[in-house]
Amino acid sequence: MVAILPDSITAETAPYFLPESNNSKLLEFLKPLPFSTIKSQSIPAVVGTQVPVFKSIDVSNLIEKTSNRLIWQTASERRRDDARSTSEELENPENEIEEDPQHFVEIQELLPKSLKDQLSLVVVDNFPNVKQYAIEKIVDSLVDTRKYKWSHVHYEFADNRSVYIRFEHVPDAKWFVDTYSSVLPDILSNKNIKVIHNNHIDEVLDELSDFKADPKSTVNSKVVSKIGSILKNKRNFERISKRSGTEDLDEVLAYYSKYEVDSNDLIDVPTNMREAIVKDIVRFRSKVLLIERDNRKKEIELEREKTKDRLKKLFAGLKETNDDINMDSETTKDLPSNIVNEYDDLSDDEYEELLKTGEKKKLDKLYQDKSHQLQSLETRERLYLTKKLEDLNNYEDDLINNKIKYIEDFKNIEESTNSNNNDISSLVSLYFNNHAQYLKVRNHKRSAEEALDAKDEDDEKKEELSTKSQDFVSLKKAKNTLEKDTEDAVPVADNAESETEPSRIEVDQTSKLQSKIVELVEEYLGIVDEFLVEVINENLNKHNLSAKDELMEELSEVLDDDSANLVNDLWNYVSTIAI
């Protein structure tokens, strides 16, 4: 029960007072109203909260102490809060802007392409799972002003990652290994951290006479403190997904545990069978989801295994480079065992002479190949020019022997030219005056020209067959000469008589001979070379069957060893048709 005190014995007062200087700096900027006569100093300090007190008790001292204590506590708390916020900003930069790393490259760019790339690459395994900009800040703190590039291999479900650092200079890599191999696990607060490097870095640097290694330096406490503050800030860490990849299927399975089949879907099902069918439906769908979940888990596990294998191969690659170093003659002392055993007994002069001999053999082989190509080209060109020269040498004789024919040809050309001019003018006139008659004349002339063309073609074929028949007779005569066992020469009368044999040679035999030549050229060369067929015909026309070796030599430039087979087959064929 609350007792109500009479107003005569109580009064209301503020629990504390505000000083007249409160917000005075702000009030100084405010101009007084032009119609106001009240000064700013005379404005009373009023507190909105009032509490009742007895009039008989003096509470002024208590109010003054309370006001002073509140003012002092407010100022000290404000200073303490400012100091705390400043310290937190220094130690835990929560509002720090995430900048893109300047030295980060894709992992493919760090694949070693030379011995220098292999030696200058350092791998920090089990590096904390921090963001890229945090990794670069940590590495910057460790390497100071040394130039480098870095990348990392990271998997979604892994808590750590592997950081690859390639220094611009090999001595910087050696300095990093010597300085941080043993202390880096303590700096990064992870005992599983390993610094992996190429084991041949010391051997290669020792071979360099002008190399001066950087002395092993001690780790600065400021560096350790800075790295520790980066690792303490949770915002610098990646958010690792704890999802297994099958949560959606698990949710569906949980749904099917409470799944109810709509009765409207089972109208056609007898009542006594509905319960069993509903169970079968739920069991079937659950089984399908379980199979799908198992398959997805297997796929995820397989992907993890592949990622582990890729990491193992990357780590093993540094060890495999040791074998590659042994194959590099510029930077290694040891050679493969088979080469060492072969040239171990040779002196320096003998080994140098051996290298010169090998180089000379290569040059000789190259010279022989080029020379063979040049000779083949020269042979073809010589045959072409020889044939052309013979035609030119025989030009005057041919012109004298056939001068009457050429004179008649010139006369015919002149007469045909004049007649053509007259014919053209008459045809033009006929074209415009009587077009139907013009068409008849044109068709008549066209038929006559076609008949003449057909006749010329038949004459050319007959002439060609006649020439081939003469060639065939010559070949037959040469064969009969070679088959004789005695050295008796063939009488001149027989030769003269044989020259009259073209009339008795059948045309189809000559055609068979030419077909056989074309067939053999296509068989051994792969294509029908008209030039090669012409060379064979020219040899047979000029030497009959007495220049077999010469024909082989000419064909060897193109067919090599197959030239002998082609000539033998041709000679055998001639012997069969010449009987």
Curated annotation (Swiss-Prot):
Pfam short name (any one): PWI
Chief site of localization: cytoplasm
UniProt keyword annotations, A-Z: Coiled coil, Cytoplasm, mRNA processing, mRNA splicing, Nucleus, Ribonucleoprotein, RNA-binding, Spliceosome
Ranges in a coiled coil: 292-380
Compositional bias per record (Acidic residues), positions renumbered to this chain: 88-99
Keyword Nucleus assigned: yes
A biological process from GO: RNA splicing
Annotated GO MF terms: RNA binding
Positions of the UniProt region annotated as Disordered: 76-101, 484-505
Record has NAD as a keyword: no
GO CC terms of this entry: cytoplasm; spliceosomal complex
Compartment list: Cytoplasm; Nucleus
Biased composition (Basic and acidic residues): 76-87
Family listed: Belongs to the SNU71 family.
Role this protein plays: Component of the U1 snRNP particle, which recognizes and binds the 5'-splice site of pre-mRNA. Together with other non-snRNP factors, U1 snRNP forms the spliceosomal commitment complex, that targets pre-mRNA to the splicing pathway.
Self-association state and partner proteins as the record states: Component of the U1 snRNP particle, a subcomplex of the spliceosome.
Name assigned to this protein: U1 small nuclear ribonucleoprotein component SNU71
Organism, as annotated: Scheffersomyces stipitis (strain ATCC 58785 / CBS 6054 / NBRC 10063 / NRRL Y-11545)
